[in-house]
């Protein structure tokens, strides 16, 4: 039986040409997660989708189909587009590439959908690096790979800002005897871990550490194929 979905909130993560006049879209939706849909005749001069299928624009989208590739139906605007420019636009592309690489089709991601929309708004108005780190943390949490940021793995004590902790994948953070001059790349200050826990990124040195920690963690999920947008960012 053909499944039909009517006017689901959505963002377009990616679009690519298909045949002479159509497009294949990668969508992010709250109740159906990542959805792949064929927009037939979307590139035609008289297409009903003309001007509607833009990235970073909140939409209401209908589709039908039983296979992984759905058939796009009605599309309506669901708010003003987020106008990203320059580095903010690259950040938006980075978010989209992350989601395409890490999300499965047809798994609901209600909270992640709202995190994504809030992140787009912050990219328009706020600090880019801090906004990306916050979204990466939220993404890991939603995927079930969130970092254990409540305490150290051995003593079960809260992090202290003047202490240092070694990151042990699949376990957590172990209190260790390291100094700020340490060149160990898997050692992080308690100050930085507390900043990540609280999603407060006012300190530039902590932000640099958190960026490395996020990359270290995400790389384990992404595998050997690098993200194209990382080569362009910062």
UniProtKB/Swiss-Prot annotation:
The keyword Transmembrane helix does not apply. One of its GO terms (biological process) is DNA recombination. It comes from Coxiella burnetii (strain RSA 331 / Henzerling II). It comes from the Bacteria. The gene is recO. Belongs to the RecO family. It holds the Pfam family RecO_N. Involved in DNA repair and RecF pathway recombination. InterPro entries: ARFGAP/RecO (IPR037278), DNA_rep/recomb_RecO_N (IPR022572), NA-bd_OB-fold (IPR012340), RecO (IPR003717), RecO_C (IPR042242). Keywords: DNA damage, DNA recombination, DNA repair. SUPFAM superfamilies: ArfGap/RecO-like zinc finger, Nucleic acid-binding proteins. GO terms for cellular component: bacterial nucleoid. This is DNA repair protein RecO. NCBIfam families: reco (TIGR00613).
């Amino acid at each position: 039986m053909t499944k039909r979905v009517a006017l689901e909130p959505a963002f377009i993560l990616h679009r690519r040409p298909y045949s002479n006049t159509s497009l294949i879209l990668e969508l992010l939706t709250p109740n159906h997660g990542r959805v792949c849909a064929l927009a037939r005749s979307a590139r035609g001069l008289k297409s009903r989708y003309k001007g509607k299928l833009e990235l970073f624009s909140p939409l209401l989208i209908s589709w039908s189909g039983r296979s992984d590739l759905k058939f796009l139906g009605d599309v309506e605007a669901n708010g003003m587009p987020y106008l990203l420019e320059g580095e903010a636009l690259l950040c938006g592309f980075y978010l989209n590439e992350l989601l395409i690489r890490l999300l499965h089709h047809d798994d609901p991601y209600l909270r992640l959908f709202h995190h994504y929309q809030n992140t787009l708004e912050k990219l328009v108005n706020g600090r880019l690096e801090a906004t990306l780190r916050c979204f990466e943390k939220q993404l890991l949490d939603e995927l079930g790979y969130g970092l254990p940021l409540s305490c150290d793995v051995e003593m079960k004590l809260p992090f202290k800002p003047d202490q240092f902790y070694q990151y042990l994948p699949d376990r957590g953070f172990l209190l260790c005897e390291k100094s700020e001059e340490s060149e160990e790349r898997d050692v992080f200050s308690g100050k930085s871990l507390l900043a990540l826990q609280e999603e407060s990124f006012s300190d530039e040195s902590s932000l640099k550490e958190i960026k490395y920690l996020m990359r270290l963690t995400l790389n384990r999920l992404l595998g050997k194929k690098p993200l194209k947008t990382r080569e362009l960012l910062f």
